[in-house]
Curated annotation (Swiss-Prot):
Function: Subunit 8, of the mitochondrial membrane ATP synthase complex (F(1)F(0) ATP synthase or Complex V) that produces ATP from ADP in the presence of a proton gradient across the membrane which is generated by electron transport complexes of the respiratory chain. ATP synthase complex consist of a soluble F(1) head domain - the catalytic core - and a membrane F(1) domain - the membrane proton channel. These two domains are linked by a central stalk rotating inside the F(1) region and a stationary peripheral stalk.
Compartment(s): Mitochondrion membrane
Single GO MF descriptor: proton transmembrane transporter activity
Gene Ontology CC: mitochondrial membrane; proton-transporting ATP synthase complex
Protein name (record): ATP synthase F(0) complex subunit 8
Domain of life: Eukaryota
Protein's organism: Capra ibex ibex
TM spans (from-to): 8-24
GO biological process terms, semicolon-separated: proton motive force-driven ATP synthesis
Length: 65
């Protein structure tokens, strides 16, 4: 049975990684990213029913003497 020739595998694998890196860099460079996303996104706070009502829990150990 002939022996498998693996002398070109390193070159093939390295060139594959280089090609994948270049392809992904080109794909990522075409995306538009916001410079400061904190200024563009506004979080609207919605009050839940238990936040609108006045509620307070008194623990016995926190009561003044």
């Amino acid at each position: 049975m002939p022996q498998l020739d693996t002398s070109t595998w390193l070159t093939t694998i390295l060139s594959m990684f280089l090609a994948l890196f270049i392809i992904f860099q080109l794909k990522i460079s075409k995306h538009n990213f916001y410079h400061n996303p904190e200024l563009t996104t506004k979080v609207l706070k919605q009050n839940t029913p238990w936040e609108t009502k006045w509620t307070k829990i008194y623990l016995p150990l926190l009561l003044p003497l």
